[in-house]
Amino acid sequence: MKKICLYFEIHQIIHLKRYRFFDIGRDHYYYDDYENERSINDIAECSYVPALQTLIQMCKDHPEFRVAFSLSGCGLEQLEFHAPQVVDLLQEINSTGQVEFLCEPYSHGLSSLANEESFAAEVKRMSDRIKELFGKRPKVFRNSSLIYNDEIGAQVAAMGFKGILTEGAKQVLGWKSPHYIYHCASDPRLKLLLRDINLSEDITERFTSHPLMADQWLDWIASTPEGENVINIFGELVTFGIFHPLQSGILEFLKAIPVLAKERGIGFALPSDLCAEKSVGAIEVPYNISWVDEERDTSCWLGNVMQREAFNKLYSVADRVRVCGDRRIQMDWDCLQASNNFRFMTTKPGYQYRGIYDSPYDAFTNYMNILGDFISRVNNLYGGADNEEIDGLITMIKNQGDELAAKDKEIERLRKKLEKYNPTEVTEKKSVAKKEPAAKKASTAKKSASKAAPASKATSEQTAPKSVAKTIETPKAKEVKKAAKKSPAKKTAAPKTAAKKK
C-alpha cells in the first residue's frame, strides 16, 4: 500500500534593524520590532491560522489522515509573543493523536556545518521544548532546510534519533528512487526519508503556475511503479496563504486529498512509522545537500566570500557562547545564527527578497557591524582572557562532561543488568526483613536496661565493672522498682512515729 508522508515546516524570520558602525559598543539591541510584529501577524492571519484550522478539521473527519510538523525555537518564541493563537492551534491538532512533531536546530541555523557541540546543544534545547509543549519527545530529526551529509547523519544517530528527513537530490540518488526507505551510510541505525522533489514542488512552487487538481496529483502518486510505496511530501506551512494566496483554492486542494487518496487505496504515515520499517539500503552523501535552489546544496548560504567570512567569524566564538551563562547573549546568539542572515548576502541570480537590505553587500555590512558588537560583548564576559586559556577551560569542561556522560551510561547499564536479577533481590530483601524484628527486640531490651540502670547504678558500680553491670542490672531492676513503690509509704510514716515519741 502506498503511503503519503506529509510534513510542514514552521519558521519565522527575525528581522535585524539598521545598525551603523558607530552603534558598535553603544547599542546592544539588534532587532526591528515593528517589522517582526507586522510580518508574523500577517503570516499568522493569512497562512498559519487558516491552514491549521483546515488540517484540524481534516484530522477529525478522516481518522486515517496523518501530518507532521517541525518548529524552530526562534520562530516558536515569536509565535508565543506575537501570535499565541497559532500555538493553541498546534496544541489542538496535537490532541488528535494524528500528528507528529519533529526536532530541528533551535536557531534554524547552520551549526551542523560548523560546531558539533553547538549543534548538539541546540538540538537538545529544541527537543526539550517540544517535549514541554506537546508532551512527547521527538524521535525523528529534520535539519535546517533539510541540510544533510554523512557526518551530520552520524551525529544525529548518536543523539538517539531514529530517522532524518532530507532532500531526494539527483546528485545523491542517481538512478535510485526517493520512494523507498534508506539508511545512513555512516550509521545504519538512522533511517533516511527523501523528499519527492517533483510531487512536493507541484504544490509548494507551481500550484498557481498551472491548474493542479487534487485527483490529477493523486493519480500521479498512484501511477508510481509497484513497490515504491513511500511518497514524502515536504514543504513549508506558508505555502498555504503566502506562497499561494487562499483565493487560489489551495486549501480546497488540501481538503480533497484524504477523500481522493482513500478512493485510490493510498494511505498516510508519520515519519516515525516509516522509520520503524526496514530500509532497502544505504545512501552515501559525502557532501552537503539541502532543499534550496536548483543545485540542492548550501551555496545560497556559503557560496561567496562575504558569506563565508561572516559564517567563520560568527562561529569563532561558538564555544565561548555555549559555556557562558548570560541569557541575553544566548538569545542574540540564536537569532544571529538564523540561516536567512546569510541568505540575504547571496549573489546568486533569482533571489530578490532581502528584507531591509538593498543589496547583498548592504546585508553583509549591516550583519558584520552587529556581529562586531556581539563578539565584543562575548569577549568581555571572560575578562580579557586570551584564546589559549579559554580554549583550555572549554576543553576541560568538555572532557568532564564526557566523563559524566560515560559514567551515566555505565550506571544505566548496571541498572539494567540488576533488573535481570530481580527475583534474587526480592529474596534478599525478604531475608533482611525477617532479621529486622529481632534487631528491633534487641534494641528495645537495651533501651529498657538503660532506663533501669540509673536506679541500680550505685550497687552495680560496687559489685561489677561497667561492662558486666549491663548484663546483671536487669534482674535487680525489678527488685529496685518494688522497693521504690514501698519506700514512699515508709518515708511518710516516719515523721508520725517521731511525733508520738515526743
Segments predicted by a language model, with ranges:
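CE4/NodB-like, metal-dependent polysaccharide N-deacetylase domain
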Residues: 118-147, 219-234
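Gly/Pro-rich turn-and-neighbor structural signature
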Residues: 117, 132, 136-137, 142-180
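Intrinsically disordered, polybasic Lys/Arg-rich low-complexity tracts
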Residues: 420-502
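Short, surface-exposed basic-aromatic patches at helix termini and helix-loop junctions that form
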Residues: 92-95, 150-165, 183-186, 249-263
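Short, well-structured secondary-structure segments
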Residues: 3-8, 14-115, 139-142, 162-167, ...
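Active-site and substrate-binding clefts of carbohydrate-active enzymes
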Residues: 2-46, 180-181, 186-190, 208-209, ...
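Generic structural signal for well-ordered alpha-helices
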Residues: 52-56, 87-91, 120-127, 153, ...
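Alpha-amylase-like alpha-glycosidases and glucanotransferases acting on alpha-linked glucans and related
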Residues: 174-222
